[in-house]
Amino acid sequence: MRIGHGFDVHKFGGEGPLVIGGVRIPYTQGLLAHSDGDVVLHAVTDALLGAAALGDIGKLFPDTDPAFKGADSRGLLREAWRRINDKGYQLGNLDVTIIAQAPKMAPHIPQMRVNLAEDLQCHMDDVNVKATTTEQLGFTGRGEGIACEAVALLVKKETGEIVAW
């Protein structure tokens, strides 16, 4: 069993679409980023890569590489997941916390879970997404951006049993 933690944050800005968990959310601004700025998928990708000891999203998809400019984060997640599968892992479970004052995430969470389950080739019961605010404290509370944390549990595909390291 391997556990990974991921964190991502992006500042609001620009006129691009707001994409969170692979869902386009109507809002006045997008998030500033080299790719599409999807904080959920970036945090999830980092959690999974960390659990598999494959580095992080910046190592795999550097923001200095023009090939990833404006990249669809679902594609990045699927490529990371392919590499993790190649190491013999499957998802045990995934828990995601979105931290944002606005917009409200609750109406979009079911589709985020569907997207994550599709991309990670797992059952929706293995994926949890929730959202919270910071009660108007800090940069997310002031509406300056969105943050996300993710924790992923990986298990070996062959047996599905706990592996002690």
UniProtKB/Swiss-Prot annotation:
Binding site for 4-CDP-2-C-methyl-D-erythritol 2-phosphate: 8-10, 34-35, 56-58, 61-65, 100-106, 132-135, 139, 142
Record-marked site positions (Transition state stabilizer): 34, 133
Catalysis: reaction(s): 4-CDP-2-C-methyl-D-erythritol 2-phosphate = 2-C-methyl-D-erythritol 2,4-cyclic diphosphate + CMP
GO process terms (BP): isopentenyl diphosphate biosynthetic process, methylerythritol 4-phosphate pathway; terpenoid biosynthetic process
Residue positions binding a divalent metal cation: 8, 10, 42
Alphabetical keyword list: Isoprene biosynthesis, Lyase, Metal-binding
Disulphide bridges, residue numbers: none
GO molecular function, one term: 2-C-methyl-D-erythritol 2,4-cyclodiphosphate synthase activity
The record's free-text note on cofactor binding: Binds 1 divalent metal cation per subunit.
A family per Pfam: YgbB
EC number(s) recorded for this UniProt protein: 4.6.1.12
Annotated signal sequence range: none
Keyword Cell cycle among record annotations: no
Cofactor(s) demanded: a divalent metal cation
Pathway(s) this gene product operates in, as recorded in its UniProt entry: Isoprenoid biosynthesis; isopentenyl diphosphate biosynthesis via DXP pathway; isopentenyl diphosphate from 1-deoxy-D-xylulose 5-phosphate: step 4/6
Entry's family note: Belongs to the IspF family.
Function summary: Involved in the biosynthesis of isopentenyl diphosphate (IPP) and dimethylallyl diphosphate (DMAPP), two major building blocks of isoprenoid compounds. Catalyzes the conversion of 4-diphosphocytidyl-2-C-methyl-D-erythritol 2-phosphate (CDP-ME2P) to 2-C-methyl-D-erythritol 2,4-cyclodiphosphate (ME-CPP) with a corresponding release of cytidine 5-monophosphate (CMP).
Subunit organization: Homotrimer.
Protein name: 2-C-methyl-D-erythritol 2,4-cyclodiphosphate synthase
Source organism: Pectobacterium atrosepticum (strain SCRI 1043 / ATCC BAA-672)
